[in-house]
Amino acid sequence: MATLRVSSLFASSSSSLHSNPSVFTKYQSSPKWAFSFPVTPLCSKRSKRIVHCIAGDTLGLTRPNESDAPKISIGAKDTAVVQWQGDLLAIGATENDMARDENSKFKNPLLQQLDSELNGLLSAASSEEDFSGKSGQSVNLRFPGGRITLVGLGSSASSPTSYHSLGQAAAAAAKSSQARNIAVALASTDGLSAESKINSASAIATGVVLGSFEDNRFRSESKKSTLESLDILGLGTGPEIERKIKYAEHVCAGVILGRELVNAPANIVTPAVLAEEAKKIASTYSDVISVNILDAEQCKELKMGAYLAVAAAATENPPYFIHLCFKTPTKERKTKLALVGKGLTFDSGGYNLKVGAGSRIELMKNDMGGAAAVLGAAKALGEIRPSRVEVHFIVAACENMISAEGMRPGDIVTASNGKTIEVNNTDAEGRLTLADALIYACNQGVEKIIDLATLTGAIMVALGPSVAGAFTPNDDLAREVVEAAEASGEKLWRMPMEESYWESMKSGVADMINTGPGNGGAITGALFLKQFVDEKVQWLHLDVAGPVWSDEKKNATGYGVSTLVEWVLRN
């Protein structure tokens, strides 16, 4: 094999992920900012001007550094693996690929050829490290000119998750060796159709980009990624695979935005900052995305009593109701969709205060994980520009705090459809904000709605930290979303909508209470939301309380962006 060394950069598929800096970095020189929002025709024809303290008055005087998203040139190449030149070569191998003959030589032709070029070092290293191709295994060979990494794919590499893991392992190896130019290949592509190869290349690219990303905005010192280029070898070339790789780059940009929004603490990301981020997305893609932001007075005109009750205590950080609309100027009929995200930028629990070590109150900055996914999807779709859909992105952003003005246990609030809710737990606030958001979404004339919310701890008891729960009374919509998630490599599981449980949600003095008994909490939460969706609208609720955050990495995951984008494109 030719010595691994730095080769000249190639020009194809130049990537500039997240080229527009996040709004989090725009407030470093001025303690105040002001912006004006257009008011929807439902409220008024006038424009309101809002002034809000940020950055200079931030608790702790924290001011984020610039976002440092990966900028990697990605291309599919037909270069033979043994002829490739660069810093690091990563090979994905299944357990079957690692089979040996009676002389302990690889049966796999590519591994056999590589081992021959390396005078048996690949075979020796994999034996010494007990590398058998199992998922999660890897072995590294270092040379004066570079490195080769073998990555285990398990019994078979049949899902996007396997290829994401391969890309992430390659990114980790590149990071540890400070590689600038890397390549990724599969030991065998037998049995992969042309379409499967294209999808595999896209998943590998996704894994490398997201695996290279580190959120260093809040570190006093950070080490920037050295990775500049990725070659994907042996999976084909041409416009189709390049388009799919570009699609992966756009989705990754949305995922990274989602991660940054959730990672940023509540003293940085307030409801107003979420609104400004939405404005920035609309400004960047102004030919296809419009924006309306409603303040508290305008929400009051729309009778959003449930949402405003949650927001009432946060007098220093007032609520903003965000509505983005994606629509290309083509005349063809468009399917009308809505993506609704829970947008609690911080959740103290209110008077039902989150207390004790198990409350995880310190992580309640991630209670806007649904909103982050919705805004990340808006950014990605602004780049991808599908022509046959009209998509409404809706977030009722606010904080759930404690004050004399705040909502109390036992209060009765009225949603914008006239239904009354007895608040028996102020810490079940997300569903109250979503109630008015779902009503608003239905009023846009949409045909289908997906809402995403870090709604219940019960879903984590049922499904653990990595899997979202999907609730819908519509089998067709369930199938659409499950297929989109599978194609994206995100995990979800359809849960039952047990209607008999609704009896436990009835109030003695109002139409309903906002929480039921302890058992089946994820189901009763979904049944609550159903009360605010028009029967003519197909609706699915994703409880993403588990997968929006990685305890292992102590970081946001950007969960939901990929599935939402894939689902929109399939409509």
From Swiss-Prot:
Give a GO biological-process term: protein hexamerization
Q: Which residues form the signal peptide?
A: none
Cite the active-site annotation.
Answer: 354, 431
Which top class of enzyme applies to this chain?
hydrolase
Pfam families per record: Peptidase_M17, Peptidase_M17_N
Where in the cell?
A: Plastid, Chloroplast
CDD domains named among the record's database cross-references: Peptidase_M17
Tissues expressing the protein: Observed during floral development. Expressed in healthy and senescent leaves, cotyledons (emergence from seed coats), pistils, sepals, petals, stamens, and floral buds (at protein level). Present at very low levels in healthy leaves.
Reactions catalysed, semicolon-separated, are: Release of an N-terminal amino acid, Xaa-|-Yaa-, in which Xaa is preferably Leu, but may be other amino acids including Pro although not Arg or Lys, and Yaa may be Pro. Amino acid amides and methyl esters are also readily hydrolyzed, but rates on arylamides are exceedingly low; Release of N-terminal proline from a peptide
Question: Which residues does the annotation say bind Mg(2+) 2?
Answer: 347, 427, 429
| InterPro entries, per database record | Leucine_aapep/pepB, Macro_dom-like, Peptidase_M17_C, Peptidase_M17_leu_NH2_pept, Peptidase_M17_N
Q: What is the effect of changing residue 431 to K?
A: Strongly reduced activity
Q: What is the effect of changing residue 429 to S?
A: Strongly reduced activity
For this UniProt record, give its keywords in alphabetical order, as a comma-separated list.
Aminopeptidase, Chaperone, Chloroplast, Hydrolase, Magnesium, Metal-binding, Plastid, Protease, Stress response, Transit peptide
> Domain of life, per the record?
Eukaryota
How is the cofactor bound, in the record's words?
Binds 2 Mg(2+) ions per subunit.
Q: How does activity depend on pH?
A: Optimum pH is 9.2.
Biological function: Catalyzes the removal of unsubstituted N-terminal amino acids from various peptides. When associated as homohexamer, catalyzes the proteolyzes of Xaa-Leu dipeptides. Possesses leucine aminopeptidase activity against the model substrate leucine-amido methyl coumarin. Presumably involved in the processing and regular turnover of intracellular proteins. Regulates wound signaling and has a role in insect defense.
Query: Which family does the similarity line name?
Result: Belongs to the peptidase M17 family.
Its recorded name reads Leucine aminopeptidase A1, chloroplastic
Task: Name the source organism.
Answer: Solanum lycopersicum
Q: What is the lineage of its organism?
A: Eukaryota, Viridiplantae, Streptophyta, Embryophyta, Tracheophyta
Q: Which gene encodes it?
A: LAPA1
